[in-house]
Regions:
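Alpha-helical transmembrane segments of multi-pass integral membrane proteins
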Residues: 9-10, 44-49, 104
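Aromatic-anchored segments of alpha-helical transmembrane domains
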Residues: 15-16, 77-88
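Membrane-helix boundary connector in multi-pass membrane proteins
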Residues: 86-103
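Hydrophobic transmembrane helix segments
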Residues: 15-39
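Canonical alpha-helical transmembrane segments
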Residues: 47-63
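Loop-to-helix transition at the N-terminal end of transmembrane alpha-helices
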Residues: 33-47, 73-74
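Membrane-water interface at the C-terminal end of transmembrane alpha helices
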Residues: 2-15, 110-125
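Internal alpha-helical transmembrane segments of multi-pass membrane proteins
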Residues: 3, 58, 62-80
């Protein structure tokens, strides 16, 4: 039950903060409207990522002795992997992809990971 609570807390924090980052990026950096990651997918993708984070923590709690320590490493690896498609948007010259837009997307991933890791490792231990 504590994993569910920790995941819910992470959801309640991460989704609005990522939407705020998106809004800020659109205004401050003039991220083009054709930038696909900002076309209505921020909230559902953030929610999906947080739910997957909670599921991963639940699995680790069942299979390893120190789930929190292992989870931090797994989450860090997942975060680094999540940046690969972000950078790829620039490499493949995706329509609307700009350095500030991609950096904002990477910041969202980082913020979500930090919130999920903190919530899961402190509340769901």
């Amino acid at each position: 039950m504590r994993i569910v609570v920790a995941t819910a807390i992470a959801l309640v924090l991460a989704v609005p903060l990522n939407l705020a980052i998106e809004a800020f990026a659109r205004q401050a950096f003039a991220v083009p409207p054709e930038f696909e990651p900002f076309q209505g997918t921020v909230a559902p993708y953030t929610a999906g990522g947080v739910v997957l984070a909670g599921a991963a923590f639940a699995v680790l709690r069942r299979v390893v002795r120190d789930a929190a320590r292992v989870y931090v490493r797994v989450a860090l690896g997942a975060l680094v992997l999540s940046w690969i498609p972000d950078v790829a948007l620039l490499v493949i010259h995706d329509p609307g992809a700009t350095v500030p837009g991609v950096a904002s997307l990477m910041a969202m991933h980082t913020l979500t990971a930090a919130i999920a890791v903190t919530s899961l490792t402190r509340i769901a231990r």
